[in-house]
């Protein structure tokens, strides 16, 4: 279960992801889920933790209920319209950029997120899903065997951030975290 500070960071980074992918055109639920998964996976591969979304195998690649709930919550708070950050989200993005500047691990997280968006943002949803389904992971049932996600049973857990050890994590000092939360309407 995510802690309140993790939820705040997840929502702020989700807004950043939506902002970063916006120039690439139409975005839908499936593509957003796949981009979130790829970002989180790449961060873990680099020993970093930023998003705290648990992902399961779904009909279209990977799916996170936490990511879905955060998106709905940001829509209710009028920080997201469809899949684009609203005017009310601009303060959140400014505060997040301030939290990133000069903090090595935070800068690395944003670099990874941007690299994923640059690589997969221009692709359509089905192409991104195919890329996700080609990723090889081990499952809790078979921890020594790596399988492409397309061969893993539906609803099987793919990523559990709380169980993954990393060398550093995206951090925001408490006062700025409170300002981020307020800027998001919480």
Predicted regions and their residues:
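Domain-edge interaction signal
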Residues: 1-186
